[in-house]
């Protein structure tokens, strides 16, 4: 692919496209790639790689150091798969990158050496040495060598300058776009600060060795929310500061996270245990203040509700018993006193008693309405059944059982054929007339 056949960038249409995004199926230059893939966290996960030197339409997968070419899978098969001589070429697989690497990291990834990158590295070494000397630490050869053992993260890239240049035929185009990207300051001032800022945005926090502005930015809304919450609690408690302390004490009394039974007393303005309920209520009742009131806890409320339900069931059962025994001989006083009252059906009994008990719960008016409705339904059902029987009888009277002749020709032939004892005579055996 010659210089006239260079693929333009799909985003700007001016520069030469050097990267291929698999997710967007787009060919981009380096500045447009930085602009497109720094939009959100999802776009940073897109895998990009260089464009094939042969076809210019597919991402590269193989690098040939002998011919200084980067080829896609199909072009590599066409070049190195059909010729036995090309099998001796030195090749290696090419992996794409994701994230938003800086210009220096891209240059190190592709084996390019930028002069600006060298100056930055020379300036960083004495600065790091000065910082370590201030802390009383010395950098020895073992510490410097241990940097190679660190596992790189998603945004760090291994420097492959020792493997030689791997940028293909368009080394000058890559160098020009890298320098433009470095001068524009899209990534950051020296290339590293931009990545650190993006890492802070992605991870939500920065190291303590930084400027501290990101940490302060995260702490300011949290402290403002705490102060606002404290002011709200003070307003609820009448403007005093005791409410906040009591709230914090209630939170810190159970550090293990267990659920302790606590009841908030509106009269005292603090929380107390359930065992103090009866004592406090007794104190309020003993004072005899007409304007004072107490709030029962959940257990007392449930007990009162259950006792009310039991009383209601007892009254209903008593009325039911009176109605059932109104038409019978009343038992003696001793028998009625000794007779136990049961609220549930005994073991082995059928559901007729439950149904009877449920029917008696309804009032007399409800029973009368139910009987009237049932009688009307039965009459309507009988009338509908009678009408259906009448229609059936009328239809039966008009029913005809006439025989239908399907084929007229067969009927005429059957009428003219000779019969012997009701059976047809074969044509071969029939006598001639």
Swiss-Prot record:
Zn(2+) 1 binds at residues 9, 12, 32, 37. This is Zinc finger protein CONSTANS-LIKE 15. The keyword Nucleus applies. It comes from the Eukaryota. GO terms for cellular component: nucleus. CDD domains: Bbox1_BBX-like (cd19821). It is found in: Nucleus. Pfam families: CCT. The gene is COL15. GO terms for molecular function: DNA-binding transcription factor activity; zinc ion binding. Its main location: nucleus. One of its GO terms (biological process) is regulation of DNA-templated transcription. Residues 319-353 are annotated as: Disordered. Zn(2+) 2 binds at residues 52, 55, 75, 80. Residues 324-340 have a biased composition (Polar residues). The keyword Zinc-finger applies. InterPro entries: CCT_domain, CONSTANS-like_Bbox1, Znf_B-box. Residues 374-398 form a coiled coil.
């Amino acid at each position: 692919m010659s210089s006239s056949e260079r693929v333009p960038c799909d985003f700007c249409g001016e520069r030469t496209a050097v990267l291929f995004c698999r997710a967007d199926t787009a060919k981009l230059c380096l500045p447009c790639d930085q602009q497109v893939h720094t939009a959100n966290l999802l776009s940073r996960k897109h895998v990009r790689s260089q464009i094939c030197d042969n076809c210019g339409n597919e991402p590269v997968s193989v690098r040939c150091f002998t011919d200084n070419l980067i080829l896609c899978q199909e072009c590599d098969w066409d070049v190195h798969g059909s010729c036995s001589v090309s099998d001796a070429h030195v090749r290696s697989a090419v992996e794409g990158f994701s994230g938003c690497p800086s210009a220096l990291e891209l240059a190190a990834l592709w084996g390019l050496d930028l002069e600006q990158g060298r100056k930055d590295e020379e300036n960083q070494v004495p600065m790091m040495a000065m910082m370590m000397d201030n802390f009383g630490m010395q950098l020895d050869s073992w510490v410097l060598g241990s940097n190679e053992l660190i596992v790189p993260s998603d945004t760090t890239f291994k420097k492959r300058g020792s493997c030689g240049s791997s940028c293909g035929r368009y080394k000058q185009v890559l160098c020009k776009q890298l320098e433009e990207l470095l001068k524009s300051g899209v990534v950051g001032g020296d290339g590293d600060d931009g990545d650190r800022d993006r890492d802070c945005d992605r991870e939500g926090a920065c190291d303590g060795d930084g400027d501290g502005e990101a940490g302060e930015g995260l702490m300011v809304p949290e402290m403002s929310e705490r102060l606002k919450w404290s002011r709200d609690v003070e307003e609820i408690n009448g403007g005093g500061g005791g409410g906040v302390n009591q709230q914090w004490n209630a939170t810190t009394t159970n550090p293990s996270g267990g659920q302790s039974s606590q009841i908030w007393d509106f009269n005292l303005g603090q929380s107390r245990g359930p065992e103090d309920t009866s004592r406090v209520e007794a104190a309020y009742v003993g004072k005899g203040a007409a304007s004072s009131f107490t709030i029962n806890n959940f257990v007392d409320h449930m007990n009162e509700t259950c006792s009310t339900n039991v009383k209601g069931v007892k009254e209903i059962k008593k009325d039911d018993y009176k109605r059932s025994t109104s038409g019978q001989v009343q038992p003696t006083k001793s028998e009625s006193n000794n007779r136990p009252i049961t609220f549930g059906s005994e073991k082995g009994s059928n559901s007729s008693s439950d149904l009877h008990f449920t029917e008696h719960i309804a009032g007399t008016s409800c029973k009368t309405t139910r009987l009237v409705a049932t009688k009307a339904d039965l009459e309507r059902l009988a009338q509908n059944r009678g009408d259906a029987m009448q229609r059936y009888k009328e239809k039966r009277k008009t029913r005809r059982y006439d025989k239908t002749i399907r084929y007229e020709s067969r009927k005429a032939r059957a009428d003219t054929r000779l019969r012997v004892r009701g059976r047809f005579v074969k044509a071969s055996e029939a006598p001639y007339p």
